[in-house]
Amino acid sequence: MNMNADPAELQKFSELAHRWWDTTSEFKPLHEINPLRLDWIDRNAGLAGKRVLDIGCGGGILSESMAAAGAHVTGIDLSEKALGVARLHLFESGQKVDYHHASAEEFAAQHAGEFDIVTCMEMLEHVPDPASTVAACAQLVRPGGQVFFSTINRNFKAYLFAVLGAEYILKLLPRGTHDYVKFIRPSELARYCRQAGLETAELLGMSYNPLTQVYSLGNDTDVNYLVHAKQAVS
């Protein structure tokens, strides 16, 4: 199996797995940004009736919401514990998602070109080789299909907000959630996309206002940002 995974990262998220669906837990930020992510993906690609792959699906927060929007969703992750939580939650939600224990690279070798939409959200900054994951996304999506990424920029402001602010001051996330050296500049992600044969269609920022405790999408890509890419039609 081509893992492209950091064992320490897997251990970290596996230990928290039972809290994925607790909206007051460490995963509260994911629950709060999920409507923004879902609306952005649906607005750009139209989820209803589409075959969608959610890479790094974790406990299934985004996967389930895309299924509820009418997509045929497959979710993959390398944390068995997170997948166990995701599968269990389907009994509660009544949604249908097909979950698999696999890396993006391994799944791409078996399912190339099978998906209309591939999502890879809040995941690239946790793998040793993000370019390999982007290349796998490009393999998995059909010609003319669409890929959606979200990750964190690498600069002083990002360190200040995403590490010091989120983990130490506001305590939105557990300490050690992010490793600054793994953050990815938009120019780097754009290069990974080009190398994989993907065209970048949109770059958008996501910001958090600590006073109102509200997340919003906009032009500020200094910290969190999203990228919409398209596979060329062959």
Curated annotation (Swiss-Prot):
GO MF term list: 2-polyprenyl-6-hydroxyphenol methylase activity; 3-demethylubiquinol 3-O-methyltransferase activity; polyprenyldihydroxybenzoate methyltransferase activity
Q: Which domain of life is it from?
A: Bacteria
Keywords of this protein's UniProt record, alphabetized?
Answer: Methyltransferase, S-adenosyl-L-methionine, Transferase, Ubiquinone biosynthesis
**Record-annotated residues binding S-adenosyl-L-methionine?**
R37, G56, D77, M121
Gene giving rise to this polypeptide: ubiG
Q: What class of enzyme is it?
A: transferase
User: Do you know which Pfam families this protein is assigned to?
Assistant: Methyltransf_23
NCBIfam families recorded for this chain?
Answer: UbiG
**Matching PANTHER family, A to Z?**
METHYLTRANSFERASE (PTHR43464), UBIQUINONE BIOSYNTHESIS O-METHYLTRANSFERASE, MITOCHONDRIAL (PTHR43464:SF19)
Among InterPro entries, the record links this protein to: SAM-dependent_MTases_sf, UbiG_MeTrfase
As recorded in UniProt, its EC number(s) are 2.1.1.222, 2.1.1.64
This protein's name: Ubiquinone biosynthesis O-methyltransferase
Q: What organism is this sequence from?
A: Aromatoleum aromaticum (strain DSM 19018 / LMG 30748 / EbN1) (Azoarcus sp. (strain EbN1))
